[in-house]
Amino acid sequence: MKILFASAEVDPFAKVGGLADVASALPRRLFEMGHDVRVITPCHASSLTAFHDGEAPVELMVNSPDGARRVGVATRTGTGGVPVQLVLDDEFFGRPAVYGEGDDLHRYQFFCRAVIETLRRDDWIPDILHINDWHTAPLAFALRNLAWGDRALRGIASVFAIHNLRYRGPDELNDMVCQAVYYSNMVTTVSPTYAREILTPEHGEGLDSLLQMRASAGALVGILNGLDYDLYNPRTDSHISRQFDLSSLEGRAANREALRAEFKLPPSSGPLAAMVTRLTEQKGIDLVLQTLPEILSSGGQLLVLGDGDEALTAELTRLQAEHPDSVRLAARFDDGLARQIYAGCDVFLMPSRFEPCGLGQLMAMRYGAVPIGRRTGGIADTVLDAADHGEHATGFLFDDFNSSAFAAAFERAVVAFHRQDVWQGLQLNGMSRDYSWGASASRYVEVYLAALRSRGIVPLE
């Protein structure tokens, strides 16, 4: 099957969030399964070296409100050998910011036009156009609208992936997201639980009725995001102080001490709790702040890596000054440091208001940390609560979004932390779970085949 994956960011060319990981790892796994996969993405400033280092780009003209513009499309090799097409327009994309620019509406509408022109002029025509979030949402309507009069586009089926319905880009693109849900042959979300949650007014962001219609037709599917187990492997990870695996779990103690040394934290009698996150309302930082007295009274410490909301940053900075032996904030994102945190913390906190999938809990379990999270979205699908799963458990969950519920879950974790056999069982269970891309990629293939069948196309399986 020929699959074109359109994304605003793709690791290692540009990365802001989890979308870049998915746009790298999922195509790679599909490629390894024998499918003919390509990725197309804007050439942001971080990709300029790769763009200019290789064969000359193909030039094409793309319409814009200001008239036709000349762009370059350079094909480079991405993760695992997957071809990645970098679309360069200096004015729109030759700048550091991937998102958050005042002209994001025009930038990504223009990128979508460039994707269509690339499809029209390329000898390689995909069976599937995999569209991701608001940045590429206009492609669904464009494909449906133009296909009748364009043979190159006629046989392409579309799949629209919702990574986070809360983030829908500029207001003018809200209708495009709605149209993408309506016009795409299939719609996916990044976890089974989130697929159910967005059918409700609470999580549907005004699209719950439309999503219910697609779900009743069998056209909405929740597929859990995977984790690249080659990239995130504590046995080989050069970013952590000491490599370890299931048979050498004592290596985590060395990583915990290295983590404390990095942040100048003294030893403590309780668990070292950590978050690697954007500092936003969604992530439940307010619950952590409200529960900090309970965390500290248990002998615990809190370490946060991430940036975002200024008020949350200021409050964490104040708490760090107030509790110099117990609280640390690194107000930035650092992938290497994040891995050291996964490898060295005892508990990983994810008290999210909602969490479409979440990769943090998957990385934490992969590195032997025990997650404490709210039972929502992908957290509910991946963390096995100690009260429900006994000897097979991997962490601790709570339901209600309030500090009392979170504090109760943390207290359960503290009790387990002081029972070495129980705690080690939780760690080993988490490390033994398989949340790699294999099973998820196979589910995507099923969705692609369903999308083709919905177009009346008999796929060559």
Regions found by a protein language model. Name each.
Residues M1-E461:
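Catalytic cores of nucleotide-sugar-dependent glycosyltransferases that transfer UDP/GDP/TDP-activated
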